[in-house]
């Protein structure tokens, strides 16, 4: 991935993020990593000037997205995840970059996924809310989909100790404002 004109990310995006056995470092850019190395996708979604946040059971806010299914490309996965987690359809997509991930687990999260090194592609886009989240079995249960001003979103994710996600929303808003 190349840094090809995106604004310099803030310090909250420079830190390594650890989730379970995976360390992830955000690499800004507008060039996709090779498809065979993409294991996950996330979107900072907007409806007009408001950001969209989903909350899962227990109240934790999340950025919509998830793991690619066998044979699925990242855009198909993104569309599926938006239906499942936000009851939404994708209208536009702009790449922000990707997390370069390394897992110390002995096996991949799922057999079809790249391992031990892979990418979590992240972008932003406009969505249309068309219904309730489908909440398929085996996934996180989304209990709320909310539209919020960006300052509220940032505060919310910081409260939940996720300054990295707050920074992704902030970066997406900054790029949208300059377009």
Question: Which residue ranges define each predicted feature?
Answer:
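Acidic, metal-coordinating catalytic segment for phosphate/diphosphate chemistry
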Residues: 1-42
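A structural signal for short, well-ordered beta-strand segments
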Residues: 43, 95, 123-125
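Short connector loops at helix/strand junctions that flank enzyme active sites
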Residues: 38-40, 56-58, 63, 116-120
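A short coil-to-beta-strand element that immediately follows conserved catalytic motifs
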Residues: 89-99
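Short acidic (Asp/Glu) patches
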Residues: 27-29, 37, 74, 79, ...
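NUDIX/MutT-family hydrolases
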Residues: 121-126, 134-167
């Amino acid at each position: 991935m190349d840094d090809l004109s995106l604004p310099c990310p803030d310090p909250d995006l420079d830190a390594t993020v650890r989730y379970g056995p995976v360390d992830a470092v955000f690499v800004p850019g507008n060039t996709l990593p090779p498809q065979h190395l993409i294991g996950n996708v996330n979107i900072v979604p907007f409806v007009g000037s408001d950001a969209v946040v989903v909350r899962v059971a227990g109240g934790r806010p999340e950025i919509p997205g998830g793991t690619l299914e066998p044979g699925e490309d990242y855009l198909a996965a993104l569309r599926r995840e938006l239906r499942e987690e936000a009851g939404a359809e994708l209208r536009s997509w702009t790449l922000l970059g990707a997390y370069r991930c390394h897992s110390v687990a002995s096996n991949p999260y799922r057999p079809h996924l790249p391992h031990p090194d892979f990418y979590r592609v992240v972008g932003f886009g406009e969505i249309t809310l068309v219904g309730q989240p489908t909440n398929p079995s085996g996934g996180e249960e989304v209990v709320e989909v909310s539209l919020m001003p960006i300052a509220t979103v940032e505060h919310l994710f910081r409260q939940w100790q996720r300054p990295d996600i707050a920074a992704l929303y902030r970066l997406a808003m900054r790029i949208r404002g300059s377009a």
